[in-house]
């Protein structure tokens, strides 16, 4: 009799807990991305791939025998690989949030990046502009995630924002050092090898 009584209590408890879920339908997934945030993350993936493409283009340019700045080329090849890794991290994040990665076309020709550069100063200025663009986009995405109460995405973006600050600072320091004297280009190129 006691066993029967406990079974009735247990079945009643199960129905009380699980029946409302069935009545109300599917429970909202708190890890799901808002459509606007998902679109913003996909745009950021494109931005990261564009940065990769630009830095790889710069590295190829600097590697030319007539340019001869293999140290700077190495620096920009490493920077390109960093941007590629960022794109992959954003893709993984979108997938983990049960959303879809939508890859878009990379158009270097319409990005305003020259095929050849006048000097290393123009290269550094191009890189700074790109890093500022990447930073601005991540800031906007962070703001959007905040408006959508998406703390998970905000937390994910925080490390990228700090890394952007460091990248821009390093490029600005490089630009300043290059203006010190005529041998700065040679010395910095040697430093990066």
Task: Outline where the language-model segments fall.
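Iron-associated oxidoreductase/ferritin-like identity signal
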Residues: 2-193
